[in-house]
Amino acid sequence: MGKEIQLKPKANVSSYVHFLLNYRNKFKEQQPNTYVGFKEFSRKCSEKWRSISKHEKAKYEALAKLDKARYQEEMMNYVGKRKKRRKRDPQEPRRPPSSFLLFCQDHYAQLKRENPNWSVVQVAKATGKMWSTATDLEKHPYEQRVALLRAKYFEELELYRKQCNARKKYRMSARNRCRGKRVRQS
């Protein structure tokens, strides 16, 4: 009466893989007691694949198209596992941006004004090139800003963690009071 476990559909395979499977079965029928190593067998298959006519290849390509259609149909009906995302505490301080991100923030508007028809991706590529060609002297102000922001972040994080610990202690002491136990004050 529980939920049915739905397995992910088997991926579609190419025309060459269909040929390979067919060729392997024929080879086993013709020479059942012969062992051929993977490398040698792969070489034989690729030679045979190159030598067959387009008419024969069309048969395998049709199989591959059918397999692809089957896979796409199954994927439309497939409902995979939902990944649970960790809920972020809104009170938790956000990490500071990197020196590169600060550089991008400063230069984005300028590049957009100069090139209004550029997409966000094109502007990002341009700022990336500007950053990689910038000298250490040009990068230094951004690195200083990052150092200040990082110091501020760690102070806020320390304060946040103290507040979280205080809330946890309060919750624990409230539970203990409900149970009739004494709580040690520290």
UniProtKB/Swiss-Prot annotation:
Record GO biological process: regulation of transcription by RNA polymerase II
Pfam families (alphabetical): HMG_box, HMG_box_2
Main location: nucleus
Subcellular location as annotated: Nucleus; Chromosome
Protein keywords: Chromosome, DNA-binding, Nucleus, Repeat
Region (Disordered): 77-98
Gene Ontology CC annotation, any one: nucleus
Gene3D superfamilies given in the database record: High mobility group box domain (1.10.30.10)
Keyword Nucleotide-binding: no
One function term, GO molecular function aspect: DNA binding, bending
UniProt xrefs under InterPro entries: HMG_box_dom (IPR009071), HMG_box_dom_sf (IPR036910), HMGB (IPR050342)
Binding region for DNA: 9-79, 93-161
Family of the protein in this entry: Belongs to the HMGB family.
Protein's recorded name: High mobility group protein B4
Source organism: Homo sapiens
